[in-house]
Amino acid sequence: MPIKKFFLAIPWPWTVTIITIIAWHYGKFKLSILTFLLLRFIVISGLWTKAMITIYLCGSSVVIACIIGIPLGIFAGLNKKADRVLTAFIDTLQTLPSFVYLIPVVMLFRVGDFTAMIAVVLYALAPAIRYTALGIKNINSELIEASLISGCTERQLLFKVRLPLALPQILLGINQTIMLALSMLVITALVGTRDLGQEVYIALTKADIGRGLVAGLCVAFIAIIADKIIVASSNRLKIKYGL
């Protein structure tokens, strides 16, 4: 796939530099140093290519989950009946064992990256919906009333008041979506992905503790970097909007 080829074609020094600069922008010196060291570990471990495939699969799945989940979350936040229906739906999704998601997608699409993405999207969809709905519902009613009195239309109210104020909460939902996507990618190694999850699975079948530990740490470090950057950006938005 073109996106996958693009990720694999980027030289690792460029990727490390860009992500470190992003970390510095949101979290300043400490976060940038932490990010640089964690990325260097992945490079030194020799698993950079598999890490980039993991980032590609996780990133693509999270984007799809957010495209589906955030609008549904907005709808749930504005409509009580939709909120009840979607809450029941995502509660059901979250109670299913992770292996269950693989059964229907393998039957329909066989094995491969696309199958893995569908399973990951289904597994990671819940936080995108839940946190967005929570962010929309928790906006101060006085701000809504003031906006309506000022003459805001419903469209302006949504895009200029509700969404900006709910954005820190939405970012935390994206953060949780990334965490769930990464955890599911280890399971989707069973359907033929060639990422860090496959490395963990191979290590498990061969009882190779060292190999499994290094691959597991690489997955954990990707999660830590994403978590720290998103939380830092969310905190900055809270300060900006006085939340």
PLM feature spans:
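N-terminal, non-cleaved signal-anchor transmembrane helix
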Residues: M1-Y56, V63, I230-L243
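Membrane-spanning helices that line or support transport/gating and their immediate boundary helices
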Residues: K50-T54, I74, R84-A88, Y131, ...
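Generic hydrophobic transmembrane alpha-helix motif, especially the helices
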Residues: L57-S60, A65-I68, G77, I90-A124
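Glycine-rich helix-loop "coupling/hinge" segments at transmembrane-helix boundaries
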Residues: M107, I136, A181-I222, K238-L243
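Transmembrane alpha-helices
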Residues: I118, L122, E154-T188, G210, ...
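Short cytoplasmic-facing helical segments at TM-TM junctions of multi-pass membrane proteins
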Residues: A128-G173, V200
